[in-house]
Amino acid sequence: MIQMQTNLEVADNSGARRVMCIKVLGGAGRRYASVGDVIVVSVKEAIPRGRVKKGDVLRAVVVRVNQNLKRKDGSVIRFDKNAAVIVNKQSEPVGTRIFGPVPRELRAKNHMKIISLAPEVL
């Protein structure tokens, strides 16, 4: 579960290293985001000469959550850290590479470009 003030790692090569959630999109009083949800983030740490800079306010798709993720077949998947991929207004990734595995729940949320760039889909 991702909520406001949650710090996330960035799982792409957009130039950001760490971001903080400042808003969960999708409804007036929505509090939590999970895998595949779009959030508004602020860049807290970035590498030099990257596409994004520290302080930028951007959109991101949550790709990994620390909380257990239950599936229809009864299995559970869990990641070590919370991670997101920076996207533009059309939900296309800003970076050209994705690092680490992503869950197949992203397919149901129509983030096919992220799935195609990911090295492993769990």
From Swiss-Prot:
Instruction: Say which domain of life the source belongs to.
Output: Bacteria
Q: Pfam families recorded for this chain?
A: Ribosomal_L14
Under the heading InterPro entries, the entry gives: Ribosomal_uL14 (IPR000218), Ribosomal_uL14_bac-type (IPR005745), Ribosomal_uL14_CS (IPR019972), Ribosomal_uL14_sf (IPR036853)
Q: Name one GO cellular component term.
A: cytosolic large ribosomal subunit
GO biological process annotations for this chain's record? translation
Hey, which family's this protein in? Belongs to the universal ribosomal protein uL14 family.
Q: Which PANTHER family match?
A: 50S/60S RIBOSOMAL PROTEIN L14/L23, LARGE RIBOSOMAL SUBUNIT PROTEIN UL14M
Q: Which HAMAP family match?
A: Ribosomal_uL14
Q: What is this protein called?
A: Large ribosomal subunit protein uL14
